[in-house]
């Protein structure tokens, strides 16, 4: 019974850490990632469709991305979607592909993006703490319903705190690594 609560708590906290990693993939660091385009939708025959589902997106070098649409008639639509997304770059359409040339980041931009990474980390910590609170409430309910003793309840809450501390430590490490990658020139 308590083991099920521990396992569920670990799973939920792991999902929060994975969500943080996905959020980090949308932040630009020294090298431009194709994930920076993940949120861009293209009007594909009247349906908003993810950019990576209407063409291939690849990184040519540290500051250049190339989009090769599977249908050439989508070039203009992809170009328009990128301009509307306001990601700080103008698409370069050569009739076959679209190239995005990202300028090198300034120190100020790096600091702002590092600040965003820290905010994402704080959001993940809040999610982890909410998971801890839910788990502790389940344990307290078991104690109240006389299914476990007060000592078992205290030990269970201590175990949940250990699980929480591990998750917070992983989040802090991820944030530190991301900040270092962003601030590295």
From Swiss-Prot:
Pfam families: RRF (PF01765). The keyword Cytoplasm applies. The keyword Cytoplasm applies. It comes from the Bacteria. Its main location: cytoplasm. InterPro entries: Ribosome_recyc_fac (IPR002661), Ribosome_recyc_fac_dom (IPR023584), RRF_sf (IPR036191). GO terms for biological process: cytoplasmic translational termination. GO terms for molecular function: ribosomal large subunit binding. GO terms for cellular component: cytosol. Coiled coil: none annotated. It is found in: Cytoplasm. Residues 127-158 are annotated as: Disordered. Keywords: Cytoplasm, Protein biosynthesis. NCBIfam families: frr. Belongs to the RRF family. HAMAP family: RRF. Responsible for the release of ribosomes from messenger RNA at the termination of protein biosynthesis. May increase the efficiency of translation by recycling ribosomes from one round of translation to another. This is Ribosome-recycling factor. It comes from Helicobacter pylori (strain G27). The gene is frr.
